[in-house]
Amino acid sequence: MIFLSLFLVILLNALLSDAVPLVPEKRAIDTMLLQTFRLMSQYASAAYCTNNFNSPGTQIQCGSGNCPLVEAADSATVLEYSKTETLTDVTGFVAIDHTNNVIMVSFRGSQSIDNWLTNLDFGLTATDICSGCTAHSGFYQSWLDARDTVTPAVQAAVKKYPAYKVSVTGHSLGGAIAPFAAAQLRNKGLAVALYTFGSPRVGGSALSSYISNQKGGNYRVTHWNDPVPRVPLLVMGYVHTSPEYYINKKNKAAITESDFQVIEGSVNLFKGNAAWLLTDIEAHRWYFTQMYTCADSKQKREVEALEGLDIVARF
C-alpha cells in the first residue's frame, strides 16, 4: 500500500509538472549547427507558402517574417510542385541557394484534407529503399508521388553545381516524407544531409537502421512536448531514425546551443521528447519560427477543424 501511494504521488507530480521532462540531460551543439538548424527550419516553413510552389525560377518569399534567412539568400527555385491530382497532395520545391552553397529540397507539412488522410494511413508497407525495409503507407506514397519529379531536378542541379551540398528538409508531414527522399537520393550516390522538424515515426526498425547509418548526416529535431514525434505508436511497429536533437525550451523562446539534448537511439523512452507525459500541439507549431504562418484562411480552417480528433491525427 505504501509503495502504491508513493507511485501515485510521483505520477501526480509528473502530470502536474509543465516545466521539465522526466529525464533532464544536456549536450550542447555548436554554433554552426544551430545556425544551420535555423536556416533549415525556415526552408521547411517556406514550403507552406503558396507562392513557393506555383512560380518556379523565382526567389523564395514568405511575406510573413518567418523565413528572413531564406529571403536574404541569393536563391531561386528550379522546381515547384503541388500534386493536387494525387491522393496525397504532396507539395514542395527544389531550390539553389548560392549564398549557402546548397541545393535545397523542401516538403510541405499537412495543410489539406488529403494530407491529413495520408497521415492516417497507418499500415506498414514494403519499400524499395532497402531490403526488408517497411514504411508508413501514407508517408511513403507521398514520396512516390513526388519522386519522379524531384529526383531528376536534384540530379540536374548537382550536375550544374557539383560543389554545392544537398539538403532535404521538412516539418510535420514534410518531415515524414524527407527521410525517404534523402535515403533514395543517397542510394543514387549523392551526399545528402537530412533535417526534419517535428517528424512522426516513419517506418520499422530495418528502415530506421538503414537511414540512420547512411552517410550525409541525419538531424531529427524535436521540440519540448510536441505530440507528433510520439506517433505512430511503438506498439504498431514504428521507430524513429537516430539521433534525436531535442530542443529543451518552451514555445517562442530564444534557442541557444545549450538548449539541445542529442540522444542516440530509435526508441528513446523517457528521454528527450518522449519523456513528456503531457503534450501540447503548440510545441509542434514552433521550431525556431512559426511553421504554419503561410497557410491561407481556408486551409487553416480545415486543419483547425481536424485538430479536435485524437492526437494521432494532429500532424
Task: Name each region found by the language model.
Residues 49, 62, 67, 130-133, ...:
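Disulfide-bonded cysteines in secreted/extracellular proteins and peptides
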Residues 36-39, 150, 177, 181:
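Alpha-helical interaction elements in eukaryotic regulators
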Residues 69-169, 186-192, 215-216:
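A conserved cap/lid and substrate-binding interface adjacent to the catalytic center
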Residues 2-19:
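Cleavable N-terminal signal peptides of Sec/SRP-targeted secreted and luminal proteins
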Residues 170-174, 178:
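Gly/Ala-rich beta-loop-alpha elbow adjacent to hydrolase catalytic centers
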Residues 89-92, 181, 205:
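Eukaryotic intrinsically disordered and solvent-exposed regulatory patches
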Residues 5, 20-31, 101, 112, ...:
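Serine hydrolase/lipase
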Residues 17-113, 304-313:
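Flexible, membrane-associating and regulatory peripheral segments of lipid-active enzymes
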